[in-house]
């Protein structure tokens, strides 16, 4: 079952990248980045809040650093 879930997560990631790609070339203003960071977001893997510093560095992040590292390493 985990393999199916991994495949679904990878497909979701690819779809999100395709959807977001046209917008990634657009620079966000500092105010927009601040608004995203202050609004907060939950990690799509563990459900914990994504730290403000991560959202400031990557406003489009949908995983916390730890879960992103695990995902990239295939855990």
Curated annotation (Swiss-Prot):
InterPro entries: Znf_C4-type_bac (IPR020460), Znf_C4_TraR (IPR012783), Znf_DskA_TraR (IPR000962), Znf_DskA_TraR_CS (IPR020458). GO terms for biological process: positive regulation of secondary metabolite biosynthetic process. A zinc finger (dksA C4-type) spans 43-67. One of its GO terms (molecular function) is zinc ion binding. Coiled coil: none annotated. Transmembrane segments: none annotated. Keywords: Metal-binding, Zinc, Zinc-finger. Gene3D superfamilies: DksA, coiled-coil domain. PANTHER family: DNAK SUPPRESSOR PROTEIN, FELS-2 PROPHAGE PROTEIN. This is Uncharacterized protein HI_1497. It comes from Haemophilus influenzae (strain ATCC 51907 / DSM 11121 / KW20 / Rd).
């Amino acid at each position: 079952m985990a393999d199916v879930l991994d495949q679904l997560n990878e497909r979701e990631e690819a779809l999100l990248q395709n959807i977001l790609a046209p917008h990634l070339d657009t620079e966000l203003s500092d105010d927009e980045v601040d608004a995203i960071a202050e609004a907060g977001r939950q990690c799509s893997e563990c459900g914990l809040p994504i730290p403000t510093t991560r959202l400031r560095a990557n406003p489009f992040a949908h995983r916390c650093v730890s879960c992103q590292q695990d995902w990239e390493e295939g855990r």
